[in-house]
Design a protein with these regions (language model features):
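Conserved nucleotide-cofactor-binding alpha/beta core module
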Residues: 1-44
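Non-catalytic C-terminal accessory region of glycerolipid acyltransferases
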Residues: 30-154
């Protein structure tokens, strides 16, 4: 899913760079969700960054032992389509030598368990990826909560 940048002239530049390898981005609205569902029902593969802070909704689930706001989009899509969920990431190699791809075994229970358990399983998979290369994770997402309330000042 893709949200246009605030600087109008950057949109096409960013899209060209990101879609150059054959991927397709969909908007971060209901039409984008419908496009993702359609792709999954056709047996296509989609990619979602499950650690993004949801703009609305979401559920608190453990993440490194602390409650973290977790999107329910991945759980919902997997549950509606019985899609296999595979987690992976691209590790940047030193000296700009490229990337090493890492994939975890599928967790089939993400698509069949209640939302709370599914969210916890998603966060556990994200944790496994982070532990493989913690220095490469973008730690700025404001996912952590205190007693269900946001405590970030900005």
């Amino acid at each position: 899913m893709y949200q246009k940048p605030p600087l109008k002239g950057l949109n096409q530049l960013i899209r060209n760079g990101r879609e150059g390898s054959g991927g397709r981005y969909v908007p971060t609205d209901n039409s984008g969700i419908r496009a993702l569902l359609k792709a999954l029902r056709k047996g296509e593969m989609i990619g979602i960054l499950p650690d993004q802070v949801p703009s609305q909704g979401g559920i608190l689930a453990p993440f490194f032992g602390h409650p973290a706001l977790t999107m329910n989009l991945l759980s919902g899509l997997a549950g509606k389509t019985n899609a296999t969920v595979i987690f992976g990431f691209a590790e940047r190699l030193p000296w700009s030598r490229g990337f090493q791809l890492h994939f975890l075994p599928p967790d089939q229970l993400i698509s069949t368990t209640p939302l709370e358990e599914s969210a916890a399983r998603i966060n556990a998979q994200v944790e496994k990826c982070i532990r493989m290369a913690p220095d490469q994770y973008l730690w700025v997402y404001k996912r952590f909560q205190k007693n269900g309330e946001k405590f970030y000042t900005k």
